[in-house]
Design a protein with these regions (language model features):
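Conserved acidic E/D residue at the C-terminus of a beta-strand in Rossmann-like folds
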Residues: 31-35, 44
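A generic structural signal for alpha->beta connector loops
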Residues: 26-28, 72, 125
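FAD-binding core/adjacent interface of flavoenzyme oxidoreductases
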Residues: 1-9, 37, 75-134
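N-terminal Rossmann-like FAD-binding beta1-loop-alpha1 element of flavoenzymes
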Residues: 3-30
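N-terminal Rossmann-like dinucleotide/flavin-binding domain of flavoprotein oxidoreductases
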Residues: 41-98
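Short N-terminal binding/cap micro-motifs at the start of the first secondary-structure element
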Residues: 16, 37-39
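Glycine-rich, phosphate-binding/catalytic loops in enzymes
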Residues: 25, 48, 120-124
Length: 134
């Protein structure tokens, strides 16, 4: 079972930002997420994020991942099934493995609430948006 100082659950902007700050301090850090970027992947054009000129959600997610990995942080794409508190930390069980950490950061993101309309997915980003500023 691998051990880390800090494990971060979620690889969206909050999780990767936390990972960058932790990894920059030379602290052993693992990000666990089912995917890279989370809901950022739903953003086709990103024009209102400081420092990102004419980008997209997936491009920003990849940029954050690259920055995190440049500080020797580790990332695993898996689903967290259970977190147990243990003496001196936490045990995190995923679909494929188990990890130990002294501390955890929960940044699991969110899933958009679908309206349940007929053909809703067909009109995603073509009139139906899940972003408050789109």
């Amino acid at each position: 079972m691998q051990e880390f100082e800090i494990i971060i659950v979620g690889a969206g902007p909050a999780g990767l930002s936390a990972g960058i700050y932790v990894a920059r301090q030379n602290v052993s850090c693992l990000v666990i997420s089912k995917d890279l970027g989370g809901q950022m992947n739903l953003i086709p054009r990103l024009e209102n994020y400081p420092g990102a000129i004419m980008s997209s959600g997936p491009i920003l997610a990849k940029t954050l991942e690259t920055q995190y990995l440049s500080f020797k942080g580790e990332i695993v794409y898996d689903t967290v099934e259970k977190i147990d508190e243990t003496e001196g930390g936490f045990k995190i069980k995923t679909t494929r493995s188990e990890y130990k950490a002294k501390a955890i950061v929960l940044a699991p993101g969110k899933v958009p609430n679908m309206l349940g309309l007929e053909n809703e997915s067909q009109y995603f980003n073509k009139g139906i948006h899940y972003c408050t500023k789109c």
